[in-house]
Amino acid sequence: MPVRPARCYKRIKGPPYTREEYIHGAPMIQIPKFDMGTTSAAARAAFPLVAKLVVQERGQIRMQALEAARQMAYKYLSKYVGDANYYLRLEAVPHHVLRENRMLAMAGADRLQEGMRLAFGSPAGRAARVEAGQVIFYAEFKPEHVAHMKEALRRASTKLPLPTRIVIEAKGDGGGKAATQG
């Protein structure tokens, strides 16, 4: 069956559904890498700037959207900056299991399904629940790559269903005012 549109799962409804020991057939998290670029702490000490992709609304982001955004940012940075010149981390983890009450839409389907009887739904995917102000992507880089980092995060944000903003600041200035916003 095809994947439902993101608008079906964008809003948070009800409590999180995360307990895998009670969920039979819960899909695996299909994001192979959460850390990209230069991952060693010694090499990351040379990166003085930090960029963050921050979500502006509360909602859910499916794992397909997170993976598409990760691939867009990773491919752009690998091509134009080089893997040795940045560190990129995906912060949002899709723990919430999405359910779907599949409805058949063909001739004779009324004899095959139960309609709204026992309509709890079966596991259909996963999503990350995010709050306003939460960081989706975190990146460290050198000052000469500011334009490329902004473009990579902008491209990643086009794959996400919620509005986002880019915050660039000096490393270690976590609570201070942002240097640049895009």
Curated annotation (Swiss-Prot):
Keywords: Ribonucleoprotein, Ribosomal protein. Belongs to the universal ribosomal protein uL16 family. The keyword Flavoprotein does not apply. One of its GO terms (biological process) is translation. PROSITE patterns: RIBOSOMAL_L10E. CDD domains: Ribosomal_L16_L10e. This is Large ribosomal subunit protein uL16. One of its GO terms (molecular function) is structural constituent of ribosome. The keyword Ribonucleoprotein applies. One of its GO terms (cellular component) is ribosome. It comes from Pyrobaculum neutrophilum (strain DSM 2338 / JCM 9278 / NBRC 100436 / V24Sta) (Thermoproteus neutrophilus).
